[in-house]
Amino acid sequence: MNLEEEMQVKWEEKKRELEEEVHIALVGQPGAGKSSLINKLIGRKLFETGVHTDTTVDMQEAAYGTLRIHDLPGYGTARFPVERWVEEFHPEQYDLYLFVFEGKLHDSDAILFTFLKQWRDEREHPFFIVRNKKDQIWDEEKPKDALMDEIAKDVRDKLDEPDAAVQFVSCRTSEGIEDLKQAIFAADVLGVKRSKLRAEFQATSMEDLAYKKQHSMKAVNTYAWLGAANAVNPVPGLDVTLDVGMFYKLLSEIRRIFGITDDLAQTLEKYKVLAPIGQRVFSYATQEGVVMMVKKLAGEFAGKEISKYIPFVGQAAAAATGYMMIQKIGEKYVDDCYTIAQEILRGILKR
């Protein structure tokens, strides 16, 4: 295999890693708050709440970054007994499952559990049993802990797993959401998918943000390599080749991962310390802004940075310069977004 072939193999490998998606299936009882739960975990309104999927026969889908969320319709009905439901929607293909319920479990739930265990054991696709609306668990004659123990025992009996974990959460109060997040992050999800889960879920701690920064730095390296290797046209007037569209996509992805949305631009202007950072971040929010920034900084990188590290000439040097530019500017962009996200989490910025 010659150098060109090796580069092509590497390019395809990095592209597959970049494009790999994580598929999450929402299953369980209608009205249990599946939509509210995934909205809470991600921190975005991906699904309308209060829509009961037992009255429909279609799957609802939403995308957020590399996450693909599949809200499956009800099962155990005359039209969709569990086995027929499995044949129709092929849920075995998804990476992980959130089984959400709020009332008593039914025989159809127990049948579904046998499939969930099969997919976990044979395909390494984990599932999580989530009892939503924890704040509404109440009985004047029994303490809440005793009621929760009874619910957990019922789940374990139907699942036939005495040590199975049951996650109790409340989307209204956020109670239990952090524990569920950590359980998902610790799940046996193979390869880069685990990293993407942590990157896309809403950050609720400084530890989450630190992980997002680490993930974003790796993404910068991947995009830098792809952006330089894939570039076929030089930036007009410069001795640099890079894929501007891919560079723009990288910066957009970094903002999304850190939860920095367009509506923050005006808010950031009110804070003296953060205003310059915000201006930098949002000045690169369009492809035109990216091109202007590349033109502004290309001379510095071509003249100083690249000569130290890359002994190339001609087109190879131009591509290598593009790589270094994406790498260095991308890392700085991550730092800026990380700083803003930290302040958001600390509550300094009020939306």
Q: Which residue ranges define each predicted feature?
A:
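Canonical P-loop GTPase G-domain recognition
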Residues: 133-199
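Short glycine-/polar-rich loops that comprise or flank the Walker A/P-loop
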Residues: 92-96, 122-127, 161-165
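Switch II of P-loop NTPase G domains
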Residues: 54, 70-118
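Flexible, charged surface loops at secondary-structure boundaries
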Residues: 18-19, 62-64, 89-95, 160
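Alpha-helical membrane association modules
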Residues: 199-351
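Conserved G1/Walker A P-loop phosphate-binding module
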Residues: 1-77, 260-261
